């Protein structure tokens, strides 16, 4: 049986932690931030851990883990 390909978009956007959780950047930080307060901007800086249901879907895009 042939090897499975990893979705290149998922490879660029998600990282798998040592415990198997998925980390991803937070959406909505590129432009039009004037209307948001500082707390919103600060809390959405960096990465967040994905939910369990999203993790199951995204892991199917990365069959070998990366």
From Swiss-Prot:
Keywords: Ribonucleoprotein, Ribosomal protein
Source superkingdom: Bacteria
Cellular component terms (Gene Ontology): cytosolic large ribosomal subunit
UniProt cross-references to InterPro entries, sorted A to Z: Ribosomal_bL35, Ribosomal_bL35-like, Ribosomal_bL35_CS, Ribosomal_bL35_sf
TM regions (residue ranges): none
GO biological process: translation
Gene3D superfamilies: 4.10.410.60
Any GO MF annotation of the entry: structural constituent of ribosome
Similarity field: Belongs to the bacterial ribosomal protein bL35 family.
NCBIfam families membership: rpmI_bact
Name of this protein: Large ribosomal subunit protein bL35
Annotated source species: Caulobacter sp. (strain K31)
């Amino acid at each position: 049986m042939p090897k499975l390909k990893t979705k290149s978009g998922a490879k660029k956007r998600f990282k798998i932690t040592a415990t198997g959780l998925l980390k991803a950047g937070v959406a909505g930080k590129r432009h039009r931030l004037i209307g948001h307060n500082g707390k919103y901007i600060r809390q959405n800086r960096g990465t967040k851990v994905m939910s369990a249901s999203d993790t199951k879907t995204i892991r199917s895009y990365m069959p070998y883990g990366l």
